[in-house]
Regions:
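C-terminal accessory module of base-excision DNA glycosylases/AP lyases that mediates lesion recognition
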Residues: 31-33, 46-123
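Alpha-helical ds-nucleic-acid-binding substructure associated with the helix-hairpin-helix region
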Residues: 1-42, 94
Length: 123
């Protein structure tokens, strides 16, 4: 709900102001450590943490298998309906250590309309 989101934003803001979360320190942590730190905050889940790592910290090897847009673009790329986490992770293992970069290309394919015939955000 909107009220929950407001309380989460306030909580994150307080954590930053109280220096319980120092955003610049995340740069020095491993991906797993940064995700753990972010998800320790109420309202910050795995999806949000991974998006922060990919788009703010510019981490190169984060695979956003929880993201609907990524999965739809993955379906388009590989012409498959199998988007189970295990299947996606196995197929995308070859992208490492550049998984985030590959994911960004898939997001770009979506943004530019390349996937429009196959992309259905809500079926």
């Amino acid at each position: 709900t909107a009220n929950s989101k407001v309380s989460y934003i306030k909580g994150v803001t307080e954590a930053v102001l109280n220096e319980n979360l120092v955003l610049s320190d995340l740069q020095n942590l491993s991906d797993d450590e940064a995700i753990k730190k972010l998800t320790s905050l109420r309202g910050i889940g795995l999806w949000t943490a991974k998006m922060y790592l990919i788009f703010v910290l510019n981490r190169q090897n984060v695979l956003p298998v929880e993201d609907v847009a990524f999965l739809q673009s993955y379906k388009w790329l590989y012409k498959t309906d199998d988007i189970s986490k295990d299947s996606v992770m196995k197929k995308c293992k070859k992208w490492s250590p550049y998984s985030s970069i590959a994911a960004r290309y898939l997001y770009r394919a979506l943004d530019t309309g390349l996937t429009k015939n196959e992309f259905y955000l809500y079926k």
